[in-house]
């Protein structure tokens, strides 16, 4: 479950890192805050569990994600570093472990789509959104 949740977070973070105007960019900017809208074809669900993920990509290459699943009473905070090379987003958690996958990034307007390089590919869609203070305040470490 942690790997699945980490994958969802990474995708969310990837989406958060790209910013754009109203058109798609070849190498979008990821910096900013994002909130997950959907994962693959399930509406923000992993299996039967509802998932809520906020991602914050800082211009200095650091990220923070806040994840909550149906079985969690609160958000869990993850942090680390990210990089974008030739339109591919990858990263590492603060504990030194790599994200479960790298992601191709597409941003159109206020929507970011992350597609994993894993098979089968997971597609996560994020909308630009400020992370609520309540989410940040209640988040605990993994």
What are these model-predicted stretches?
Residues 18-79, 85-142:
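Lipid interaction determinants
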Residues 1-21:
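Sec-dependent bacterial lipoprotein signal peptides
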């Amino acid at each position: 479950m942690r790997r699945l949740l980490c994958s969802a977070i990474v995708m969310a973070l990837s989406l958060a890192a790209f910013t754009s105007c109203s058109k798609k960019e070849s190498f979008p900017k990821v910096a900013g805050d994002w909130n997950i809208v959907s994962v693959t074809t399930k509406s923000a669900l992993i299996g039967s569990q509802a998932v809520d993920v906020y991602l914050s990509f800082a211009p200095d290459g650091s990220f923070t994600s806040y994840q909550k699943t149906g079985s969690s009473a609160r958000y869990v905070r993850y942090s680390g570093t990210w990089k974008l090379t030739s339109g591919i987003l990858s990263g590492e958690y603060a504990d030194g472990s790599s994200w479960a996958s790298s992601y191709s990034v597409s941003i159109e307007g206020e929507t970011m789509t992350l597609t994993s390089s894993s098979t089968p590919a997971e597609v996560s869609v994020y909308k630009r959104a400020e992370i609520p203070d309540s989410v940040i305040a209640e988040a605990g470490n993994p």
